[in-house]
Amino acid sequence: MNDILETETPVMVSPRWDMLLDAGEDTSPSVQTQIDAEFRRVVSPYMSSSGWLCTLTIECGTIICACR
């Protein structure tokens, strides 16, 4: 159990963000609409099968979930 706490959490970055940044636009992953879209894309399949409803709070960077 202690090993889990000591390992570094992997960070997932959307390939779409990388493309926008490489294109030279002043767009970053912190843009709320991009974060919301990626969150829905990644989390939606799990929410529909599990009965949980989740949202991401950008201020704290936390995921809040509630059972339907």
From Swiss-Prot:
Cross-link annotation Lanthionine (Ser-Cys), location: S49-C54
Modification after translation, per record: Maturation of lantibiotics involves the enzymatic conversion of Thr, and Ser into dehydrated AA and the formation of thioether bonds with cysteine. The 62-67 beta-methyllanthionine thioether bond is oxidized to a sulfoxide. This is followed by membrane translocation and cleavage of the modified precursor.
Phylogenetic classification of the source organism: Bacteria, Bacillati, Actinomycetota, Actinomycetes, Micrococcales
Keyword annotations: Antibiotic, Antimicrobial, Bacteriocin, Lantibiotic, Oxidation, Secreted, Thioether bond
GO biological process: defense response to Gram-positive bacterium; killing of cells of another organism; pore complex assembly
Cross-link Beta-methyllanthionine (Thr-Cys) placement: T57-C65, T62-C67
Location of the protein in the cell: Secreted
Protein name (database record): Lantibiotic michiganin-A
